[in-house]
């Protein structure tokens, strides 16, 4: 249910190329999210291993026997103790990585019903997490492609709510 930019390969050759970009950390993927609470550090690197949740096979969890997983976090804006607007940079790309890492740090993604506390004061249909930036070398030509989008409706709605409360 994450919104924003998405890469879909059209053929096997491009799929293989994309898989290698990810494996070699040559694909830069950044996300914007609203986290519950006041995240304690302005910059953080979360490097807890992630694996399948033993109690619920549809969920992932931080586990000592999990796969290495690294998420860089940078605070953009704080809203007191209620919420924190952050940029997240995936170094690895595990299933639900951002949601698992932030929940494990006791600051789940806002309105995340799977890993967080459910709906907050501002209702949205899904968690407030948006893929907003991609940078990679185009297959075959190696031309650098850089894509960036503005905050979507759900992110804007929650940001507006918290910004208006400060006034």
Language-model features, listed with the residues they occupy:
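RNA pseudouridine synthases
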Residues: 1-167
